[in-house]
Every structure is written in C-alpha cells, then in structure tokens.
Design a protein with these regions (language model features):
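Glycine/proline-enriched, intrinsically flexible loops and inter-domain linkers
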Residues: 1-459
Length: 459
C-alpha cells in the first residue's frame, strides 16, 4: 500500500520459540523447567503458526518462499532466557512502479474510500498490547487485541488495487493499509496535510454492538484506505465490483486541518482533533540505562563426546530438516516462483534465497533472504548485528543481484526485552553497529519493525 499502490509478490516467515520438548530424550531441553504456558505450548506455536502462514499464502495466492526457525533457552546466573514470548514474523516482498511510489497531496473534495471487510471487535488496542510484556494485562485484554486474517477478503481488495496500479494512469491519490489503530490511524495519515471528515454511519459494521470507539479503532484485517478524486470514484467502483471487493466511500478531504468522525444521523462527534495535535512534534523518548558487562561460562565439552554432540545439534529445530514446514503447502502458487525453499530431486529445503519473477515471460525478478544472530548478540550485541547482516548477504549472493550491493535493501527488525536492566544499552549498541555496518557497505535500511517488549510475565 505504498504511494499510490503496489503489488505483493511473495511471503516470508520466521518462527522463534522456547524449546519444543518433543520427547524426554532431549537432555539439553532440561536446563530449565517447563513453564505453565499462558496460551500455547512452543510445539503448538511452531505447528499452528506455520500452518496459518502457509494457508494464508495459498489462499491469497502469495507463496511463502523463504523462512527460518529457531528454538532457544538458557539459564545462567539467575537469568532465564528463552522465547517464551514467541516470535512469528510474517514478512514479504513486492514491487511498485517508480512513478507511483510517492503519495500525492489530496485536494479538498476528494473522496476517502475503504476497500475490504467490515468492522468487528478484533485487534482492540493491538499496538499497546503488543508493546507490553505478555502477562502484564489480563488474558481478556490480550486476547481481544489479537488480529484475525481473512485471505479471501484481502485478495479481493488487493486485486482492486492491482487494477488501478496496472492502468495506464493510476487515479489513486494516496493509499494506506489498515494496521494498529484501525480507521483512526489509516485515514488520518491519508489526510494529514489537509484534513478530513469521516461519516461514522458509512463505516461498514459487521457487529451492531460496537461502540464508536471500537468502530474507529479496531484492527480488523484486510482493509485498505485510499483517497481518490470524486470524478474517478465510479472507475474504482467498477473495478471493485469486478473483483467482488466491498468498497465504501466514507468521507471527504477538507482543508480545515482537522480530522473528524461525525454521525450524520445523530450529529455526534466521537472524535474531532486538530491535525497538529495528532501529528505535531511529539516529545522525544529518552531511554536511560546503564551498561552491564555480562559474562557467560566457557563451554564445557569433551572431544570424546563429539559424535554425541553432533547428533544432538542435528536434532535442533534450527539445524534439522525443515520439510515439516515446507512440504505441507504449494510453494509455487501463482506461477512466478523462480526459487523457493526446496531443491533437487528429493525437494529438500536447502535453498538460502527465494526468488520471484516479475512476470511470466521476462527474466527480471526480486530476491529475498533472511539473517539473524540472537545468540551471538547475547555475547556481543554489535557483533550480533553484523553477523545478522552478513548472514542475510551470504544467503542472497546466490541470486544475480543487479547493481550488486546497491541493488539490496535491508529490513531491520528488532525484538528486544527492553526495560530490563542493561537491555536498552545493549539495544543501542546493536542498532548503532547495524547502522554503521550498513553505511560502510553502502546498503540502505528503508524499513523495519521493533517489538521492544519481548518479556514474558507469569502469574
């Protein structure tokens, strides 16, 4: 949903959990006692999260072509480390036309439109809850913040956008996806330079018990917000009808630099803010911490036991064959997959890079790879950043990248247990090292995500 619209190509996925505890014979998994898991066991997460990612990709027509999995726990010096708060990172690659990559400024009278599904009590407070330690809120609040997916609806909306993007002239002025904060976040960012008036009664409601706050702020998935000229509304409606995508004209662009939700039937205004109050200069966040020099015990091993160690290492989910992740799904859905996880006559998941063609005839494409080094980062956060970048680059070199390093962009994703003593300082070291290393290589980092609350609390 960048600029005036873009086209998704393929998905990626990373799963990180604590040890799966598949059986009693895995001695390394007994270093920490098994916890009373709050919602799902690690093995359930590994199975069900991957099922969901694969199923979504198949239904949407966006193949899952690369990924990674890691399980880890460590107990030393009264510090318990592990992915009890699990990571399921869903990413992806796509492309857009250069001339459509910049959002245009809306004009007064332009129409504010929503493509996609209706509002439900889903994803309430998702941004706040995802930024809090798991267990900090009641289970009801945490479960209420969980998003749900609807690939069929997303495909319909995406196809409507594709129809505009692939036209000779794309009439979309600006487009934005719905994420945390729902309509409040998405629609306000569309009109942050001008102002907008949203008719609360025109917002599609699937649950009649929703309050105004829930209608405005829910994170029901598979919706896009966009601005389009009034004269071009019929064109978008025809394309949406062809793709069977629900479409709603919910408001107008104004020039009063206010963002307002108003019910035309009751006259109520549950929200009416000046844009400067929403997008003005926010106070800088100051993170105060101290550096703690953590030392870890030297590895205690015997050369006589190397065959045993090897057998154990080969059983780790991060090392063992990943066919349980790949062989349950069509990895070539859509017909543009040039390289996915599996290779050879046995289709073993050994490829380091995923590649998608841009069309069915040409030889232009997009490559993607993944790198991470959380264990190295425990010992040295700066080294961990460099190793993660190095791993991603050593994985992607198997694709003939146009313009070499200048043709590569990074997405930096930080999952960190901030506010624990010493962790903010370690994060600073890691981010600075990542920035310095990328600059030295001449690689840009245009995007990324942070989850700075990777801490699990138990009752």
């Amino acid at each position: 949903a960048g600029g005036q619209g873009s086209l998704p190509l393929a998905g990626t996925a990373v799963y990180m959990t604590s040890y799966s505890r598949l059986n009693e014979q895995r001695g390394w998994e007994k270093g920490m006692p098994e916890r009373k898991w709050l919602y799902q066991t690690p093995i359930d997460i590994l199975i069900k999260a991957s099922n969901g990612a694969s199923d979504f990709g198949n239904k949407f027509g966006q193949p899952l072509i690369t990924g990674s999995v890691l399980t880890f726990e460590h107990n030393e010096n009264n510090r318990r480390l592990g992915y009890d708060k699990v990571i399921m990172q869903a990413g992806g690659i796509g492309y857009g036309k250069a001339e459509q990559s910049i959002k245009h400024k809306p004009s007064e009278g332009d129409k504010i439109v929503i493509l996609g599904g209706e509002n439900y009590r889903i994803g309430m407070g998702g941004a706040a809850v995802s930024s809090a330690d798991t267990g900090a809120f009641s289970s009801g609040i945490e479960l209420n913040a969980i998003q749900r997916s609807n690939p069929e609806m997303q495909k319909r909306a995406a196809n409507a956008i594709r129809g505009m993007v692939e036209s000779d002239v794309n009439q979309i002025v600006s487009i934005h996806d719905h994420g945390a904060g729902g309509h409040l976040n998405c629609l306000s960012e569309l009109v942050e330079e001008t102002g907008g008036l949203i008719d609360l009664d025109k917002l599609p409601v699937g649950d009649p018990t929703l309050s105004a706050k829930e209608i405005i702020g829910n994170e029901s998935q598979e919706r896009m917000g966009l601005v389009i000229g009034k004269d071009n509304l019929d064109l978008l409606q025809k394309i949406a009808d062809r793709e069977r995508s629900p479409m709603y004209a919910v408001g107008d662009v104004t020039s009063n630099h206010r963002f307002t939700f108003e019910s035309k039937t009751t006259g109520e205004k549950p929200m009416d803010f000046a844009l400067e109050d929403m997008f003005g200069s926010s106070p800088k966040t100051i993170m105060a911490d101290k550096t703690i020099d953590r030392q870890y015990a030297e590895i205690d091993y015997s050369t006589q036991n190397i065959p045993t160690y090897l057998k154990q290492v080969l059983q780790l989910e991060a090392v063992a064959c990943k066919d349980w992740l790949t062989n349950k799904v069509d990895r070539c859905v859509g017909g543009k997959v040039a390289k996915q996880q599996c290779a050879g006559p046995l289709q073993l998941p050994l490829n380091n890079v995923g590649v998608m063609a841009l069309d069915y005839n040409g030889k232009e494409g997009v490559a993607t790879s993944i790198g991470h080094a959380p264990i190295a980062a425990l010992i040295d956060p700066a080294a961990g950043s460099r190793v993660a970048i190095g791993e991603s680059l050593s994985n992607i070199i198997w694709a003939p990248i146009k313009n070499n390093l200048k043709g590569i962009s990074l997405s930096a994703n930080w999952m960190w247990a901030c506010k624990n003593e010493g962790e903010d300082a370690r994060l600073y070291e890691a981010v600075k090292a990542c920035s310095d290393f990328a600059i030295a290589l001449g690689i840009n980092i245009p995007t990324g995500k942070d989850s700075l609350s990777m801490k699990q609390k138990y009752p």
